């Protein structure tokens, strides 16, 4: 049975601006039917890496937060720390980056909570029912503490997943640093010797005695290592690193399984804005020009159908001249495969459907 995906274009006038139109979209799509009264509501979004300007403006987040508050809910904006070195690898830097990009209580009407804590190791292990690659997903604690979960996604391309949509925002985004490692990595971490200062933090955090300090440097015993990634979170010099070696198909399937861990068993709703569709992730410290014109706003209770509708909407557009999707050979009707030919984005939606998260069949309802 097809799921309903609601769509609003980006036309606006004196009687209704785009924030008001988003509110109407949420109402029409049924978000108001969720019982928000006295509930803690996680609004999951990406605050943007410093230097990137393609992330969603704080005004969009405020519109969603206000909708929740008007119905008695207690919203907060949230994301988890990144696995790689950058402006969001710990909660302090992450908060600074969010504020630098305009996110704060005054601009969004609610507080920001970095879900996996100061060092990215405040996590909950959540069973993945039917998981083939992940049995227990490592999810940021604040995400799982919320009574209601709302995803607010900037839909764009992604260099590893093919595109970054609702499932990517939830599955990868809600993983703790160890959870992100599990998705990206098919092996175990190693220590970059020239960065290691021999402080022993990795040894202290490891429950399996895998890190060994020898000659003032840490070395990881892979026979003891279980690949939990906690050593990555505590290393002050980012010397503990992973091999980014998971296949794109397996990565996408793991993203789907992590998404299932987040959304199972509680009210959820999903919003995706197909605007400023950059070819790469908002995790990058820059953003290339959009690959297609702005399309509009989409909303649904079904995250799989939502992603499918957004993909179809982007692929129906003519690529912008001079963009990464302009010209080239092959994949004429798949802009994401054109710009990232080695990716397999369909595997995420197919696996999500198999897991029962949603369906790729949808009915598009324009408001």
Segments (PLM) and residue ranges:
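Extended, low-polarity segments enriched in aliphatic/aromatic residues
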Residues: 2-60, 66-79, 84-367
């Amino acid at each position: 049975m097809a799921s309903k995906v609601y769509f609003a274009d980006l036309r606006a006038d004196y009687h209704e601006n785009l924030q008001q139109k988003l509110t109407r979209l949420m109402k029409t799509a049924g978000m108001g039917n969720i019982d928000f009264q006295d509930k803690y509501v996680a609004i999951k979004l990406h605050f943007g890496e410093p230097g990137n300007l393609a992330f969603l403006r704080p005004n969009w987040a405020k519109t969603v937060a206000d909708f929740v508050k008007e119905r008695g809910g207690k919203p907060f904006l949230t994301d988890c720390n990144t696995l790689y070195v950058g402006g969001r690898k710990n909660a302090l830097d992450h908060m600074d980056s969010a504020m630098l990009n305009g996110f704060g209580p005054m601009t969004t009407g609610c507080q920001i909570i970095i879900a996996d804590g100061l060092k990215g190791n405040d996590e909950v292990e959540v069973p993945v029912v039917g998981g083939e690659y992940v049995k227990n997903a490592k999810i940021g604690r604040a995400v799982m503490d919320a009574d209601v979960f709302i995803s607010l996604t900037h839909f764009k391309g992604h260099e590893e997943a093919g595109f970054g949509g609702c499932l990517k925002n939830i599955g990868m985004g809600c993983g703790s640093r160890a959870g992100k490692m599990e998705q990206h990595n098919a092996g175990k971490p190693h220590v970059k010797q020239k960065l290691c200062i021999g402080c022993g933090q990795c040894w202290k955090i490891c429950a399996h005695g895998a890190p060994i300090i020898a000659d003032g440097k840490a070395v990881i015993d892979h026979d003891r290592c279980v690949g939990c990634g906690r050593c990555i979170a505590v290393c002050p010099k980012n010397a503990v690193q992973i091999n980014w070696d998971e296949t794109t198909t397996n990565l996408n399937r793991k993203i789907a399984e992590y998404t299932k861990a987040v959304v199972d068993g509680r009210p959820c709703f999903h919003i995706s804005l197909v605007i400023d569709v950059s070819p790469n992730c908002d995790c990058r410290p820059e953003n290339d020009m959009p690959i297609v014109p702005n399309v509009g706003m989409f909303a649904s209770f079904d995250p799989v159908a939502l992603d499918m509708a957004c993909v179809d909407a982007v692929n129906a557009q003519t690529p912008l001249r001079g963009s990464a999707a302009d010209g080239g050979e092959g994949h004429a009707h798949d802009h994401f495969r054109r710009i990232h030919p080695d990716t397999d984005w369909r595997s995420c939606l197919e696996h999500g459907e198999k897991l029962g998260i949603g369906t790729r069949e949808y009915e598009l309802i324009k408001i």
